[in-house]
């Protein structure tokens, strides 16, 4: 008791004196081990000119100090851009399938799925702020006492706002908003058209009412059905039932932000029971957060720490690449990965067909890979088998071994093949390029001269290099984030996915804050550098599979409207 009292008095005196400190928990041995590690790191921090105060903030943010040093080195030296060799196209890195072949692959998956544990992984942590960006800008800049909405649209050349207002009654949230407006403004019916539209937008985004820009996309009304309005959570539950269930069980994993988890759970409580009842399939739902330890420090143009008004360090999330750690924690034979906003109101059967077909491609290739690795382990591979495996690597996995391979001894050839095959596998749907912003499939050369298939974002390309720009512009396909992943090896053990990340494929993100340049580091993207060393198969899939809602006006597209 006296010890606890002494500790709390001592702690308070440190707080009063504004002295940085770290509180350790655990038994004596673990506290001692932690203390030694902290002291070692603190002395390292001091060598690099980092104050005790800053060190404590970094420690409390759970970021290993070596990671901070790595980030500072990256800010100083920059990051090499991707070296594009050519776009991946059908018959040159992208597998093209006929409708019959899609059906055949899907049927193969249906045949095999009962012996597999399936899971759907949906990144869903972001707020919907970007979705309503043009509406927020309108509310910030528009003064209804000084100009008309039409004058604002002309002044700003804001076609998005014009479309939003013209098609307002087509949005699935229109009726609920209209009802609320009539409660708030008793004279709403007789108001001028501009006032009606202005109040509609204001109420939609107001924190006192609908507050849509601060909510996660997952809980927003997306689709108007005859009987009800569905949000993306419900649509993902429906998709689970259609293609991600085996033995009457489906598993769904959302990555969410901590502040939004209650919103998810409240929705899931109602929707899960409804979908389970209609389908007869049990759906297990789990959540995880993006680890704080994957955040980045923020620096200025001199690579010095940037601080807020309270003199605290500023940390930023490390981007969706951080989710490789969440994916690494999952246990399943086949994992479907899809973004929260890529759902459809109609044609769910068609979507299911293509998802199942991708899974069929994965299982077929995986069977062959596992068979070869099993034979290698049992030493059943002979010299005359190598040609067949080399052809498989080339034709099915787009891996060329190069001329040096022929000079290897038999033992080294087998070791090389084992190293190439013993990796997680991803099958990625690719849609026809229609000018959407985002990444695409390319043949890329790394710093060791090795060429492989990668999904590359525009921000990874040197846009000042004419040749690279031409290759980027020649892309025929686009990455819709439509992945099916195999994360277990031939012994049915989970891979450590962190071992297959290309740490050199991150991004430096530059932003202007109060007129000053600030930089932060974004981890290699989940489907970019985080999976750079996976076995990769790209499959062309129809555009019907890609229906993202990036802005609120996307809800006006046919895929999100009643038919």
Please identify what each model-predicted range represents.
Residues 84, 240-247, 472-474, 528-529:
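Short, flexible, solvent-exposed loop/turn segments with mixed acidic/basic and small polar residues
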Residues 26-28, 290-292, 488, 544:
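Residues that form or immediately flank small-molecule/cofactor binding pockets and catalytic motifs
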């Amino acid at each position: 008791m006296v010890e606890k009292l002494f500790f709390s008095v001592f702690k308070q005196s440190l707080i009063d004196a504004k002295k940085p400190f770290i509180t350790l928990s655990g038994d004596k041995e673990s506290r001692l081990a932690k203390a030694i590690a902290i002291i070692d790191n603190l002395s390292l921090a001091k060598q690099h000119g980092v104050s005790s105060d800053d060190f404590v903030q970094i420690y409390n943010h759970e970021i290993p100090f070596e990671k901070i040093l790595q980030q500072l080195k990256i800010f100083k030296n920059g990051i090499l851009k991707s070296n594009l060799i050519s776009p991946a196209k059908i018959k040159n890195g992208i597998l093209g399938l006929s409708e019959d072949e899609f059906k055949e692959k899907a049927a193969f998956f249906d045949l095999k799925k009962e012996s597999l544990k399936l899971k759907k992984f949906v990144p869903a942590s972001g707020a919907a702020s970007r979705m309503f960006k043009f509406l927020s800008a309108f509310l910030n800049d528009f003064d209804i006492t000084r100009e008309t909405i039409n004058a604002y649209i002309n002044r700003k050349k804001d076609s998005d706002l014009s479309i939003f207002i013209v098609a307002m009654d087509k949005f699935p949230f229109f009726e609920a908003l209209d009802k609320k407006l009539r409660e708030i403004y008793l004279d709403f019916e007789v108001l001028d058209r501009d006032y009606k539209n202005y109040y509609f937008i204001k109420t939609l985004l107001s924190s006192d009412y609908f507050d849509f820009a601060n909510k996660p996309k997952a809980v927003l009304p997306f689709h108007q059905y005859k009987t009800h309005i569905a949000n993306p959570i419900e649509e993902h539950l429906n998709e689970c039932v259609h293609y991600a269930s085996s033995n009457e069980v489906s598993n769904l994993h959302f990555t969410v932000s901590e502040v939004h988890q209650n919103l998810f759970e409240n929705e899931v409580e109602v929707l899960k029971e409804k979908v389970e009842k209609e389908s007869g399939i049990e759906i297990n739902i789990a959540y995880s957060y993006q680890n704080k330890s994957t955040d980045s420090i923020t620096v200025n143009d001199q690579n010095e720490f940037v601080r807020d008004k309270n003199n605290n360090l500023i940390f930023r999330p490390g981007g969706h690449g951080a989710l490789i750690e969440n994916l690494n924690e999952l246990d399943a034979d086949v994992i479907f990965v899809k973004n929260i906003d890529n759902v459809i109101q109609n044609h769910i059967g068609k979507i299911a067909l293509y998802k199942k077909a991708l899974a069929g491609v994965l299982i077929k290739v995986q069977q062959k890979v596992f068979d070869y690795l099993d034979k290698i382990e049992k030493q059943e591979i002979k010299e005359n088998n190598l040609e067949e495996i080399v052809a498989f690597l080339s034709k099915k996995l787009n891996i060329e071994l190069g001329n040096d391979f022929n000079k290897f001894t038999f033992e080294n050839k087998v070791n090389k093949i084992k190293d190439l095959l013993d990796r997680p596998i991803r099958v990625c749907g690719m849609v026809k390029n229609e000018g959407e912003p985002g990444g695409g499939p390319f043949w890329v050369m790394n710093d060791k001269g090795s060429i492989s298939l990668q999904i590359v974002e525009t921000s990874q390309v040197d846009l000042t290099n004419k040749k690279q720009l031409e290759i980027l512009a020649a892309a025929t396909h686009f990455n819709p984030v439509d992945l099916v992943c195999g994360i277990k090896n031939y012994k049915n053990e989970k891979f450590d996915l962190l071992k297959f990340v290309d740490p050199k494929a991150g991004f430096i993100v530059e932003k202007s804050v109060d007129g000053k340049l600030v930089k932060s580091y974004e981890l290699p993207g989940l489907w970019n550098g985080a999976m750079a060393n996976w076995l990769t198969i790209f499959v062309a899939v129809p555009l019907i599979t890609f229906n993202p809602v990036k802005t609120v006006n996307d809800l006006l597209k046919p895929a999100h409207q009643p038919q």
